[in-house]
């Protein structure tokens, strides 16, 4: 009786082994190519942004995604929707993922500062002067250079009828560029300058410009502090068939390339995304880096 029962057990075991081998073979055939396409990386960077509705932050995320395609670096991104408590949670969550370097554009809050202090890794702080000393490296666009260069470009062509598009009050980059632009004007030029609040994105800028142009017809030059807000103002002018203005702006190359139509004059910045990845990788490898980095002309 025992020998008779052993044979079915042996057959069951043999069948199980054959099924396993067949399963492995089919898996390789079906999924082998997918596995081969998965790219490994040596450095993992965590990025915490206040909000992506800010044109500069949205552009930075896209730039980073593009730059990492050909590099041995991966970036995990989170945005806080303008909420400082959410940013604190984002920072802690990114740290729990085991990132090697943290990149943070901080919301003005002591809670955020405390969350940064708790990190046990290199930290790159972006574009908030109040947090200059909060991380390993502070990085920002050279707003003084950009603001002055933009004003000089415009004043070479126009002495009056200048409209400056003011961005969100919560955007430190926009505020710094505006201050540099205005500071480079003479007293008379400052008095004749018109400033229009246009919000933080293209749609808000277009709406603000439409209302403005209905009752204002003496503008000759429009100065934008980001590509998207300038483009919004341009669209409003086109829809109202106002073709008597010149449009001047500043931004990085990738943001500018998104605008395919229209005649614009640009101050072009180098890529912050590339610099973030370069510095992040150097910090990960334990190399010495500059404590303050300004992104200037392309």
Question: PLM features: what roles do these ranges have?
Answer:
Residues 13-14, 25-35, 185, 269-298:
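Hinge/cleft segment of the Venus flytrap/periplasmic-binding protein
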Residues 107-148, 252-261:
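Flexible loop/hinge segments that line or gate small-molecule binding clefts
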Residues 2-17:
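N-terminal Sec-pathway targeting helices
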